[in-house]
Every structure is written in C-alpha cells, then in structure tokens.
Swiss-Prot record:
Catalyses which reaction(s): CMP + ATP = CDP + ADP; dCMP + ATP = dCDP + ADP
Record's subcellular location: Cytoplasm
Binding-site residues, ATP: 7-15
One Pfam family in the UniProt entry: Cytidylate_kin
Name by which UniProt lists this protein: Cytidylate kinase
Coiled-coil region(s): none
Biological source species: Rhodospirillum rubrum (strain ATCC 11170 / ATH 1.1.1 / DSM 467 / LMG 4362 / NCIMB 8255 / S1)
A single MF term (Gene Ontology): CMP kinase activity
Chain's gene name: cmk
Length: 213
C-alpha cells in the first residue's frame, strides 16, 4: 500500500506521515528533505539555488545518507528547497528515486508513506490513500515561528508569515508539478488539531478507505 501525504509548509503533514508510518510499520520518506538536501548542496558549493545547472548536478549526485543532516531543518534549507523544487530538471531527476521507494519499500515493509507537495498528483497518482494536510497560513506561520525560536533563531512573526506566503505562492505557482489537491484526496485541516487528533483522523480515513475496497 502507498499512502500519499501532501500539503503546504508547516501544515503538520511531516509529523502525521511519520506517526502514521510508525503506527502501520510502513517505510517513510520525507520527499521535502530530498529538495532541501539538493538546495543545501548547491549553497555549500558556492552557487545560487536558482542556478538550474548547479541544482541539477546536485540532484544527480544526491547521497541519501545526507538526509539526516541537521542543517536540512533550517529555514535556509526550506527556502532553498522551494527554489530548486521549481526547476523541472531537478524534479525529474528525483522522481525515479521517490517512485522506487514507494513501489519497493526498504527492509521488506508492507507499504510506504511519502509526504511532500506532489505525491498524490505526480509522484504516486496510483496511491491507494491520499491525504492533503492543510491549516491556515497564520497557524502555519505561528508553528514555524515556535519551531525556529526553540532552535535559538531570533525571528519576527511578520517575517515568518511573509516568507510562508511567498513559499506557498512558489509551490502552487510553479510550472511543473505544482502543489495541488488530488481529485481523490481527502482534505485534513489541522488548524485546530493536536498531532494526536490528526493521527486519529488519518487512521479513520484509512479505515473508511479499507471498508470501501
């Protein structure tokens, strides 16, 4: 079984996807980290994330072992990911890796959970379960603010909110694989939900899907 979890930044999709994978003993892939790793590799190489040639080279040379790098959780990595993720050649280079993970989960797992922006629409349109996780931009900005401040970053809420809106616009407006809700996806608004409530709601969605099949 393939479970596709999509949604904008700080919607809670990553936390939900990880907990869902743990609960079901499925393999888990945070596809956003692939783009963060590419973006940071470009920056470390002294290039600009907008440089398509440098970004493509980084995508082709991506080492999955680098996905545990703490720098991938920084705001800089997030912004770079949004930029390189809008480059068609980069998305194409990472597509096979994601699809192979979904169809051949590592370590004999019975299924896979992937989270990102275009899992249900482009990467795994055949996924048996698709959930689009969202929340108001204000709630998402506040979540990101708390996350950054807890990491020791001195940031202003207005700046985080502005960056969040700009990132949403980039993710939804890119020419290739824009963030969109799949026609057969269930929308889960986590604005007023705890992580535990979101997990319960997702498990209910899975149970409902199982009953229909």
């Amino acid at each position: 079984m393939i479970i596709a979890i999509d949604g904008p930044a700080a919607s809670g999709k990553g936390t939900l996807a990880r907990r869902l994978a743990t609960q079901l003993r499925f393999a888990y892939l945070d596809t956003g980290k692939l783009y963060r790793a590419v973006g940071m590799a470009v920056i470390k190489g002294g290039a600009d994330p907008h440089d398509a040639k440098a970004a493509l080279a980084a995508a082709r040379a991506l080492d999955p072992a680098t996905l545990g790098d703490r720098l991938l959780s920084t705001d800089t990595a997030g912004k770079a990911a949004s930029v390189v993720g809008a480059i068609p050649e980069v998305r194409a280079a990472l597509l096979d890796l994601q699809r192979d993970f979904a169809t051949h989960p590592p370590q004999g797992a019975p299924g896979a959970v992937l989270d990102g922006r275009d899992i249900g629409t482009v990467v795994c349109p055949e996924a048996e379960v698709k959930i689009f996780v969202t929340a108001s931009v204000e709630v998402r900005a506040h979540r990101r603010l708390q996350e950054l401040r807890s990491g020791g970053h001195d940031v202003k809420e207005d700046d985080v909110l502005r960056d969040m809106r700009e990132r949403d616009a980039r993710d939804s407006g890119r020419a290739v694989a824009p963030m969109a809700i799949a026609a057969d996806a269930v929308v889960l608004d986590t604005s007023r939900m705890t992580a535990e409530q979101a997990l319960t709601a997702a498990l209910d969605i899975l149970a409902h899907k199982s009953q229909k099949t």
